[in-house]
Amino acid sequence: MPRLTIRDVQKMKDDGERITMLTAYDAVSARIAEAAHVPLLLVGDTLGMVVQGHDSTIPVKLEHIIYHAEIVTRVTEKPFVVGDMPFMTATTNIEKTLENAARLMQEAGVSCVKLEGGAFIAPTIKALTQAGIPVMAHIGLTPQSVQQFGGFRVQGREFDSALQLIRDAD
């Protein structure tokens, strides 16, 4: 069975289908998710907290994501696998960001990369997609910004922050 593609995910969205995504960091969880017909798997930087025991995602390196994502892609056939871009790997330096995203695609075999941030990362997303790298954006509660927020805080409760989330999603 072929791996799902970005076009498959877009069709699911266009058809109004509810899309399930689970996080997987290892062979066991990836196989269980695939057996349960979960169409999307995220190899997220939360592995820093869940697997490595850190109190945030900040210490996670690109090499950690590549290692875990390669395991997930190796043991699954169908799920669309999303690889997280850890803290400071998707920066204002577009060339470095392209290099990091390309490593995730080439070395780990992910279907797409995930970046945290809002409208300010639009130029980065444009550069990545023009280079042929599919991107999934993560807005709202962004763990890589936990230090800036002073901890994990719900976003969008106040009018101004809710409006900013809408702008970011656009």
Give names to the regions the model predicted.
Residues 2-170:
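Alpha/beta enzyme core
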